[in-house]
Amino acid sequence: AIDEAEDRERFDELLERCNIPRAPGRTVFNLDEALAAAEEIGLPVLMRPSYVLGGQNMIVAYNKADIIEYMGVITEHVDMDHPVLLDKYIMGTECEVDAICDGENFLIPGIMEQVERTGVHSGDSICVYPAQHLTQDEIDTMVDYTGRFARELHVTGLVNVQYAVSHGRVYVIEVNPRSSRTVPYISKVTGVPMVDMAVRCCLGEKLTDMGYGTGLHPNAPYVAVKVPVFSFEKLHAVDTQFGPEMKSTGEVLGIAPNYHDALLKGLIGAGYTFKTPGPGSCCIFTVKDSDKPCLLYTSPSPRDVDESRM
């Protein structure tokens, strides 16, 4: 199952059998193949080696220079017996699902939504349970796709699936037939003992006999926000830019009746400080050029943004 999820050709065959869409992608072994694939798919593209954890050696390439630099580094330091994976980068909302499977049925304790854009490693993104900005159709689609993966891969135990949602369509980013770093978080905030249940499934018990039901577990009556913690102030000469490679060294949890308060608790717990705004207060946004058009739609008062300084 692990090889089927990690090997690009076998994974594409799995998606075809399950009738599940994914971003266009190719496998490449050298620079010429990478440039040709990027031209065919269209920039930007997500590039990563096969069989990696923590987003190691992954980048989002926005131009040919990025591809040339990446392939030069990767072919020098990585075993090229396995190909480099090159996928179309989809800008959207990233979501994550951890599920327990007994070989027939599956249980999803909850769907998690990442605050940061797709392309930022999920371990470095603020994570929200339950998802705040998904439609019911998108939720139902994720539950359906997760069940198809669990059955087709014959998973007994835990499986992790990462999704990207763009313009109402759900795409699969990757499937990991194993435990993930979000299992302790989602177990704690939902009250579903995932590890205990997964072990019982491996020993032959059925989910229907464990008292938590199957499919998607009902949402808790509160919001839980996981905020990453970084150690940049202790590590010198470290690239602080977020991307597909994980850089956080810890995390904190904020729980409250609503999203706003849970997020505020989490940020304060992670060491951020906030001052109560007074008359004439302003907020300074530091945004790269390619993201500036989005700023007008995400700032609290778009009409108050000084576009002359953009």
Where are these regions (language model features)?
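A short, GP-enriched loop/loop-strand-helix hinge that lies immediately N-terminal to
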Residues: 1-5, 21-26, 299
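Short acidic active-site motifs
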Residues: 33
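ATP-dependent carboxylate activation and anion-phosphoryl transfer catalytic cores
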Residues: 1-5, 9, 14-18, 41-44, ...
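Conserved small/polar residues in nucleotide/adenosyl-binding loops
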Residues: 297-304
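Short acidic-hydrophobic, aromatic-tinged amphipathic segments that line or gate anion-handling sites
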Residues: 26-29, 61
